[in-house]
Regions:
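Residues that define the transmembrane beta-barrel architecture of outer-membrane proteins
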Residues: 11-15, 64-68, 111-115, 129, ...
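Residue-level detector of the transmembrane beta-barrel scaffold of outer-membrane proteins
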Residues: 18, 35-39, 71, 80-82, ...
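Gram-negative outer-membrane beta-barrel transporters
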Residues: 1-96
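C-terminal beta-signal and adjacent terminal beta-strands/loops
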Residues: 46, 87-96, 121-181
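Extracytoplasmic gating/loop element in the C-terminal half of outer-membrane beta-barrel translocons
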Residues: 82-116, 120
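Short glycine/proline-enriched turns and hinge-like loops at secondary-structure junctions
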Residues: 30-32, 100-102, 129-130
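Short, well-ordered amphipathic alpha-helices
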Residues: 16-24, 116-122, 177
């Protein structure tokens, strides 16, 4: 009698938090106009451990353990300004402890954050069609993510891996038009 058995395992633990708040600025002072929307996300994943087969050394992820994103929007009539702050915690490049361990000159990497801004103008045509023209600055402060091992973001880097979801392009601008067909 034989049976296929997947003896590998993966242990993960984590928590997610979200908070949203919207208010009219006239509620603060009658002379103010517009609407402010704030939104925040926090993810903490302290454990992500795998083993490929019984007796194999445990492998620990080298991804950051904490991530946070905060969105802010101010809308006044047909104009809006958006800001997004994205952060991840530092982490370790060491994925295996004990037999098979690799020792790195820089075993840990630091935390990292970026800031994006968007200015949008909503345009309404005579037939009721609505379009938006926007100007966006990604990574406004030209931050460079720390280099890690065993991972790669897109477009990647000639110097090694970077945490997933990050890029090494630096600051860039986008101008565009959005509309519904």
């Amino acid at each position: 009698l034989s049976e296929n058995l997947n003896a590998a395992f993966n242990v993960t633990e984590g928590e997610d938090y979200e908070i949203d708040y919207t208010f009219n600025t006239a509620d603060i002072a009658d002379s103010l106009a517009g609407i402010v929307t704030l939104r925040g996300f926090l993810n903490v994943a302290p454990v992500n451990t795998t083993s490929n087969f019984p007796g194999a050394p445990l492998t620990y992820t080298n991804q950051p353990k904490g991530h946070a994103t905060v969105f802010g929007n101010y809308t006044l009539g047909d104009w809006s300004v958006d800001a997004q702050w994205h952060w991840f915690s530092g982490g370790t490049n060491i994925q295996v402890y004990g037999a098979g361990q690799t020792f790195y000159t820089q075993p840990y990497f630091g935390s990292f954050s970026t800031m994006d801004f968007t200015l949008t103008k909503q345009i309404t045509f005579g037939d009721g069609t609505v379009m938006s023209a926007y100007f966006n600055v990604q990574n406004a402060f030209d931050s460079v993510p720390p280099y890690t091992v065993g991972s790669s973001g897109n477009p990647g880097s000639i110097f090694g891996g970077i945490p997933q979801g990050e890029d090494v392009m630096g600051r860039y601008f986008t101008i565009g038009v959005r509309g519904n067909l």
